[in-house]
C-alpha cells in the first residue's frame, strides 16, 4: 500500500481526507469510506492509490441518499493510521499530528481534510464573494487548521460541531496554497471546479 511507504504530496492528501471521512472499524482492522455518489470519483482515486482490489459498492442510506462505499480490511493499515490519530470514534477527539507532517506536506493534508469536511462557496448575494469553511466535531482540530492557514476569524460552535469560516479576497490566497501541489487524483473535482471559477 502506497500510504505505508515514503512521504509524498499524495500520501498526505489521503491522510487528511481519511482524517475527515475515513471510518476505522472492527478494532482497527477495517477502514471504510462512504460518500454520496457525487463524490464517486474520489473513491476511485483512493482505490487506485491504495492499489486495492476491494469493491466499491452502492446503497441508499437511512436518509435516502445514494451512496458508495469502500471497505479495506487490513490490521497493518489500521495500525499505521493510528499513528496519525485516525482511530475509531475520532470525531470529537481528532488532533492533526503536526509533528508527523513535514511542512512541505501540510497543505496537502489540509486539502484532503477540506475535501472531506470543508466547503468552498461563491456568495452570489455578496457580489460573488468567495468563502471557505471547515467543520469538525473536534475543536482542537479546527484550532489547528485556523493556525496552519493563519486565519484570524473566530471559531463558532454549531451544535456538536465547530466551524471555521472565512470569506473575501484572502480566500483566494489560501486556496492557491492549498491547491498548489494538487493533481486530478488528489482533489475533489466539484470543489476544485468552484475554485477555478473563483480565480477566473
Each predicted region: which residue ranges?
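Internal intein/HINT superfamily modules and their associated LAGLIDADG
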Residues: 1-200
